[in-house]
Amino acid sequence: MIAVAILAAGKGTRMRSNLPKVLHQLGGKSLIERVLSSTQNLSPSRQIVIVGYSADQVRTEMQGWPNLEFVEQTEQLGTGHAVQQVLPVMEGFEGDLLVLNGDVPLLRPGTLQKMLATHQEHQNAATILTAQLPNPKGYGRVFCDAQMHLQEIIEDRDCTPAQRQNQRINAGVYCFRWSALAKVLPNLKAENDQKEYYLTDAVNYLDPVMVLDVDDYQEILGINDRKQLATAYKILQDRIKDDWLVAGVTIMDPDSITIDETVELGTDVIIEPQTHLRGDTKIDTGSRIGPGSLIENSHIGTNVQVLYSVISDSRVGDNSRIGPYTHLRGNVQIGEKCRVGNFVEMKKTTIGDRTNVAHLSYLGDATLGTQVNIGAGTITANYDGVNKHPTQIGDRTKTGANSVLVAPITLGANVTVAAGSTITKNVDDDVLVVARQRQSVLPGWRPISSKQTEK
C-alpha cells in the first residue's frame, strides 16, 4: 500500500505573484496537478496535500481531484515540519509514503515506479531519488557506496574541494516505510541557521537507506521563478514533440511550435512553423496544419489543410481546406471536401459536404446544406440586439457577393440570391431572388462645390 504526500504550503515569493506557486500553469495544467498525475500509475490509496499559503484557494482549485486529503501547515518551518503535519491523519497506516514537492512538475511516472520498486525490493526504510547534475554548484552532495546505500549528505558550503567533484545531488523525492518514519518525525530538531526542520535529518535515523539516480536530471527541475517555469515548459514541449516525431508526425520547425499533451495526431500529419495545438484537439492522418495556425479543442479530419487560421471548439471534415485567415469558433461543423477561405468567420454554424465559403463572410447560427456556394461578403445578420436567430440554407443554393441574410430566415434548395441583396423573408426552392433598389441615373447632375456652400 502506498500513500502520497505533496508539499504545497509555500508562497513562492520569487514568482512575484498573488497566485500560490503550485497553481501556476505549465502546459495547460497547474504544477501540482502535474505532480499528482505522475503518481497515478502507482494507484495510491491516499493522496495528501500539505497546504499553507492561500490554503483555501489551493483546495478550491483542486476540486477536480475528489480523493485528495488536505492538511494545513500554518507556519512554513521546513520540509520535516511539513511532513510532521500528516502524523495525525496517518495514524494506523501500514505501507509506504512517497513524499514529493508540489513545484517539481516534470517527474515521469516511470521514474516513480522504478523508485517504489527499488524501495520495496530491498525493504528499505527510506529511498532517496538523486540526480547527477553537470553543474551541481550550490546543491548538497549525496554520498553512497557501490551498492547505492546512503553514506551521508553534505551541504555544498561544507564540502571539501574533493567532495565537490561529486555531482550527485538530492532531488527532494523520498519514499519511506511509514512505520519507520513515524517513529523519528517527532524527534526532528531545528538546529540550523534557518531554524527549520529538515526531512533529510530524519534519514539519519533510518536504516537501510538507498539512493536511486534519475535517468534524466531535467525531471527534478524545481520551479522557483518565472524563468524556471519557462525552462520547464520548453523541456515539456521537447518531450511531447520528440514523441510525435518518433510516432510518424512531421514537425517542420519544432522550436516555433507548441503541442499540448492532450493533443492526438495521426500518422503523416505535417505541422508547419508557428502553429499551436491546444486542449482536446485531434488531427487525423495526412492533414497539414499551418503555418501560423491555432487549433484548440477541435477535431480535424483526414487530409485537411489549415493555413493561417484559428479554430476552436469545432470540427472539420475530411479533405477540406481552411484558410488563410479563417476563424471558426463555438461549435462549427464543416463537412467533407469544403472550402472555407480568406477572412471568413463562423460561429455555431454547420455546413454540408462540398460547400464553399471562400471570401470575406460572417456566418453565425447558420445551417447550410451540401454544395452551397456563399459569395464574397455574404453576412448572416443573426443578432437583433437582444437575441440570436438562425439561418437555414438549402442544398445547392448560391448567394451573390455582398448579400445580407436577416435572420430568422430560411432559403430553400437551388436558390440563387442576386448580388447586393438584403433578404428578409423566407425563400422557396428553385428561384432567383433579387432584393435591392433599382439603380437610378440622373443625367447632368453635379455635386455642389465647397466654395458654393461657403456663399
Swiss-Prot record:
Protein name according to UniProt: Bifunctional protein GlmU
Cofactors named for this entry: Mg(2+)
Function: Catalyzes the last two sequential reactions in the de novo biosynthetic pathway for UDP-N-acetylglucosamine (UDP-GlcNAc). The C-terminal domain catalyzes the transfer of acetyl group from acetyl coenzyme A to glucosamine-1-phosphate (GlcN-1-P) to produce N-acetylglucosamine-1-phosphate (GlcNAc-1-P), which is converted into UDP-GlcNAc by the transfer of uridine 5-monophosphate (from uridine 5-triphosphate), a reaction catalyzed by the N-terminal domain.
SUPFAM superfamilies in UniProt: Nucleotide-diphospho-sugar transferases (SSF53448), Trimeric LpxA-like enzymes (SSF51161)
MF (Gene Ontology): glucosamine-1-phosphate N-acetyltransferase activity; magnesium ion binding; structural constituent of carboxysome shell; UDP-N-acetylglucosamine diphosphorylase activity
Subunit structure: Homotrimer.
Gene source species: Acaryochloris marina (strain MBIC 11017)
Entries under InterPro entries matching the protein: Bifunctional_GlmU (IPR005882), GlmU-like (IPR050065), GlmU_C_LbH (IPR038009), Hexapep (IPR001451), MobA-like_NTP_Trfase (IPR025877), Nucleotide-diphossugar_trans (IPR029044), Trimer_LpxA-like_sf (IPR011004)
HAMAP family membership: GlmU (MF_01631)
Binding site for acetyl-CoA: A376, N382, Y383, A419, R436
Chain residue ranges for the region called Pyrophosphorylase: 1-226
GO biological process: cell morphogenesis; cell wall organization; lipid A biosynthetic process; peptidoglycan biosynthetic process; regulation of cell shape; UDP-N-acetylglucosamine biosynthetic process
EC supergroup of this enzyme: transferase
Keyword Transferase: yes
